[in-house]
Amino acid sequence: MSSENAQLKKDLIKAVLSPLFPTATEGGENMDSNLKALLDAAIDQKVDESETVTAESILDPSLPARWIFARITPGTTISIVTDSGDMIGPVVFVAFDQVHGIVFVTQESSVTPAGQATTLIDVDKVESVTFFS
């Protein structure tokens, strides 16, 4: 995203939140302005952080689970072991939201009526991935 788009995003968020901060003073100090300034700084920082997420940082081999899921073809059958030791699968890989770090998988429901269940997994909680041929 370009810097103009990032600035527009910041300005829009601030404009939506501005009615929450009418000018008022308490003890001679404008408390709402101080709070608004802190919120503005937090918005700027968060938007700037989201702008620094690039393809290079998402595909960085030092982040192995992200690296793996960024390269899996949708429709691939896999099993996932989480950092808590839970095994998920076999499941069918659907998609990977690289910005938010969410893995989407589906599996046939074992309850009636028959259907599919979609599971969303935090990529940072994945310990290993097994591929089936």
Curated annotation (Swiss-Prot):
Alphabetical UniProt keywords: Glycoprotein, Sporulation
Effect of inactivating the gene: Spores produced by the deletion mutant are more hydrophobic than wild-type spores and lack the polysaccharides layer. Mutant exhibits a crust-like structure, which is loosely attached to the outer coat. Disruption of the gene does not affect the localization of the other crust proteins.
Localisation: Spore
Main location: other
Induction remark: Expression is regulated by the sporulation-specific transcription factors GerE, SpoVIF and GerR.
Highest rank taxon of the organism: Bacteria
Effect of T106A: No change in SPS layer formation
Transmembrane segments: none
Domain description: The N-terminal half is required for localization to the spore crust, while the C-terminal half is necessary for spore polysaccharides (SPS) addition.
Protein name: Spore crust protein CgeA
Origin species: Bacillus subtilis (strain 168)
